[in-house]
Amino acid sequence: MSNPLLSLNYEPAIQALGGDYYDEVLSAEFPQHILRFRNDQLLPKIGLNSQDVKDEHFIEAFGKFHCVRPFLALRYHGYQFGEYNPYLGDGRGFLYGQVRGVDDELYDFGTKGSGRTPYSRSADGRLTLKGGVREVLAAEILHRHGVRTSRCLSLIETGEGLWRGDEPSPTRSSVMVRFSRSHIRFGTFERLHFYKRPDLTKKLLNHVINCYYSNLKKENISQKDPFQDCYFLFYLELVKRIAKLVAQWMAAGFCHGVLNTDNMSITGESFDYGPYSFIPTYNPKFTAAYFDYSGLYRYSHQPLVCKSNLQLLQEALAAVIDRKNMRSALEKFDDFYLHEYRQLMMRRLGFKKLAEADADKLLQLTIKMLTDSQVGYHDFFLELRQKFSPEWRDDISQIFADFEQPELIDPWRQYYYHLLQTYSDNELEEMTERLQQYNPQQSLIRPVIESVWEAITLEDNWQPFYDLLQQIYD
């Protein structure tokens, strides 16, 4: 039987742009291949039936890397903690291939841990198994939260011992294949600006619009240059996408950890999960990465950092897009962000279409209560999901009746009760459904991840990992 993963109609979209954007590389050879995770939810998106794709097919395609060539290590630079770094690029992964989904959109298969490339520098090009497990979990819980995110298609343990400064070593190795819209980053354009290649910038920008913003071409009015009127609209749409993305992170209680420009996708998708963390309690100063000594990428700073990264990108795009137009587009970021964040938080609280003033007051009271009480951020929303009852509209005493610090929740409780008075019986039932939909049963705070990893590393017990994934999906 032929391998369905190798029989896909791979589309060389990046390769067709030419060698200015990538280096052709080879994959590493590994001593062992154990499939630890396969994402059957993604297979229908590329026209495959999960029953037709066997475990050995994943190993052949995404562990042994048979048949599909060439592999492309993409070139990029980036601002890392505010400093420009021209020595970047895919250092432990490559673009495996691109396929057209059943929705006619273009998707990437990108590897992580597949071996050394010209951009590995002194690193080994490998991915720790713990790093792979963490990325699988991050992507799936964020997807469950409704975040526009890359996801892991497969995770294969590869039988090597790796040495890392931030993990007990030797630690186990893995190779992952990531499923995403694109691996083109802000830093991809920043590299072209660094080398003063406006021709390559325009060529890549046309490609991005064609593949990921094709709806904009229908809005252009210029006959002389079919892209000219799209460039500003592209940047405006990117501003909107990034604003919505960071609002989704904030509502989910997610702290990315390393918001360098090389970790930001030009499609506005969340990807590349390293030292991320979910906030245990509402703490604006919470920092995910142990090496972020200044707190630059702290939880509350994420919207400002994303806006700043969009501003930095203007320099790289200025050869094609008018600076004044980009500045005016970026001025809309705050409004895009606040609108999305307000809407997402109201959903988590069960409401829909509240008046803006009511929503803002409830949001203010919610954040104050979470800050003052230091109740678990995810615990609060899970408890709201589990305990909410239409009877709350008639009896305020039932609303979080057993909250340990009643004086801290009382202002919130009073206003929540006030808003319930405007809801009909049918609307209260819809609230119950929203609370179920937007508040996952499982959180992904550090102790949860460490518990899963402890079972794997001490006993090679993967059941807690699979159980956690199932709880995320439920």
UniProtKB/Swiss-Prot annotation:
Residues bound to ATP: G89, G91, R92, K112, D124, G125, R178, R185, D272
The protein's required cofactors: Mg(2+); Mn(2+)
Keywords: ATP-binding, Magnesium, Manganese, Metal-binding, Nucleotide-binding, Nucleotidyltransferase, Transferase
List of catalytic residues: D262
Record carries keyword Nucleotidyltransferase: yes
Catalytic reaction(s) noted: L-seryl-[protein] + ATP = 3-O-(5'-adenylyl)-L-seryl-[protein] + diphosphate; L-threonyl-[protein] + ATP = 3-O-(5'-adenylyl)-L-threonyl-[protein] + diphosphate; L-tyrosyl-[protein] + ATP = O-(5'-adenylyl)-L-tyrosyl-[protein] + diphosphate; L-histidyl-[protein] + UTP = N(tele)-(5'-uridylyl)-L-histidyl-[protein] + diphosphate
Amino acids binding Mg(2+): N263, D272
Enzyme Commission numbers on file: 2.7.7.-, 2.7.7.108
GO molecular function, one term: ATP binding
PANTHER family assigned: PROTEIN ADENYLYLTRANSFERASE SELO, MITOCHONDRIAL (PTHR32057:SF14)
Entry similarity comment: Belongs to the SELO family.
Main function: Nucleotidyltransferase involved in the post-translational modification of proteins. It can catalyze the addition of adenosine monophosphate (AMP) or uridine monophosphate (UMP) to a protein, resulting in modifications known as AMPylation and UMPylation.
Database matches in NCBIfam families: PRK00029.1
The protein's name in its UniProt record: Protein nucleotidyltransferase YdiU
UniProt source species: Trichodesmium erythraeum (strain IMS101)
